[in-house]
Design a protein with these regions (language model features):
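Accessory cap/linker subdomain of secreted extracellular hydrolases
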Residues: 189-325
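Short, surface-exposed "cap/lid" segments of acyl-processing enzymes
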Residues: 61-64, 68-103
Length: 432
């Protein structure tokens, strides 16, 4: 009897084990089911300059699918929006634009992403091209990309939308204004509304100083140590020269930061190695900002831009001055994290107010509590690296779905504060 029970137990365990392994194999196989297709393209930007691009489309169906162009944020950005240190031994960097493209293409959209001029994968830079780039070049590049997207056989040229993030929120409205018959909708994420000069001062002087005084100087001594600065991801890149910043991004060696700071503040620390916030940190932050805004820098920061770029950027009319020129038939979705330290949520409120003032009939603002510039949980002081939250992606898709003819459903955001225009095509109920 006991032997029979033992055999039954063994057989039962064997069946259970087999079932578990089958479930695991099925789950593993599910991960490799192809839901989207990729096609690499080359965009001719003119004057002998070309850049790589990639189109993602649903794996099933011939289309034509509604098209989406993603316009990236500031700095040296490849088509994936690669964020974070890029080096052999470090963690995988984030790729937020690839994340958006995959999400939308799995659900029925053809999405085009492209490298900025002079930029290749993993922050490889053609210094001659990148160092002479201006915001006007980037606007024209986006127009070229829209034309390429519209020509793809899988894309319906009558249903094209643009997603712009950060700096892309400066470019996208201008492309929409100049291509009003092609661009049906724009999605602006991490919004720039007012003067670029004022926004950069906030980013590089006002907010860092407030952070140092309220967070790092816990004892209210007016002092901070070099060790504290070298460990702080926001402060260290604002205070050190761009050459040191670039070396750090390539090596992820914090000693590079510490050594650079010690040279900057040589003979300016007290016995304990502390420096004055008011007399050392503040003047250096202002000096870095003035060097940038005066266009007097003789050396380019290849991670960001050169003076030729900032000169053109600062002369650009703010979005508040041009947003009223967008066609009334163009749908506008505004998205902003409430803890965004680079493009504060107040920027989004201003743009929404302006759209209301000019009686734009189809716009909606969604703000997300606790999310930062990358639409990931962040403090109000600095951007935390992480993937875009799924409910943000769901909001983008739902709105585009309702505005691209994929469904007749009304748009209802998931997990945010919503402020909508009076329009029959949107759900006007506020959620929180």
């Amino acid at each position: 009897m006991s032997m029979g029970l033992l055999l039954m137990a063994i057989l039962t365990l064997s069946c259970l084990s087999s079932s578990i392994f089958r479930q695991q194999d099925y789950a593993l196989a599910q991960q490799y089911i192809q839901t989207i297709k990729y096609r690499n393209l080359v965009i001719d930007l003119g004057n002998g300059i070309k850049t790589n691009a990639q189109l993602t489309i649903p794996a099933i169906g011939k289309g034509p699918f509604p098209g989406v162009l993603i316009i990236s944020g500031s700095g040296a950005q490849d088509k994936d929006g690669t964020v974070g240190p890029v080096h052999k031994n470090g963690p995988e960097p984030l790729t937020p634009y690839l994340q958006i493209a995959r999400y939308l293409s799995e659900r029925g959209f053809a999405v085009l992403r492209y490298d900025k001029r002079g930029i290749g994968a993993n922050l490889t830079i053609d210094h001659k091209i990148w160092g002479n780039s201006t915001i006007n070049d980037l606007i024209n590049d986006a127009k070229k990309a829209i034309a390429v997207l519209a020509l793809q056989p899988e894309v319906d040229p009558t249903r094209i939308s643009i997603i712009g993030h950060s700096q892309g929120t400066i470019i996208a409205p201008r492309v929409a204004i100049d291509n009003s018959t092609e661009v049906k909708n724009i999605v602006l994420m991490g919004i720039v509304a007012s003067s670029i000069r004022d926004l950069i001062y906030l980013q590089r002087v006002s907010l860092p100083l407030e952070y140092v005084e309220k967070v790092l100087d816990k004892n209210h001594t007016g002092l901070i140590s070099i060790q504290q600065i070298s460990k702080n991801s926001m402060l260290r890149l604002l205070l050190i020269p761009s050459s040191i910043a670039l070396t750090f991004l390539r090596t992820n060696d914090t000693n590079v930061i510490k050594d650079g700071l010690e040279k900057i503040f040589a003979n300016k620390t007290n016995v304990a190695g502390y420096i004055s916030i008011e007399h050392q940190i503040k003047p250096l932050l202002i000096k870095r900002y003035e060097n940038l805004s005066s266009f007097s820098s003789s050396k380019c920061n290849m991670v960001e831009y050169c003076s030729v770029y900032y000169r053109a950027l600062f002369s650009l009319l703010p979005n508040l001055s041009i947003i009223g020129n967008i066609s009334k038939s163009t749908g506008i979705l505004l998205l902003n994290g409430e803890n965004d330290s680079l493009t504060p949520v107040e920027q989004a409120f201003l743009l929404q107010q302006k759209l209301t003032e000019v009686n734009h009939p189809d716009h909606v603002l969604i703000t997300y509590p606790n999310l930062g510039h990358l639409f990931y949980s962040s403090s109000r002081w600095m951007t935390t690296y992480g993937p875009i939250q799924q409910y943000v992606l769901a909001d983008i898709y739902s709105w585009l779905e309702a505005h691209s003819g994929l469904s007749e459903s009304f748009f209802k955001p998931t997990n945010a504060f919503t402020n909508t225009a009076n329009t029959s095509s949107l759900n006007t109920n506020k959620t929180s």
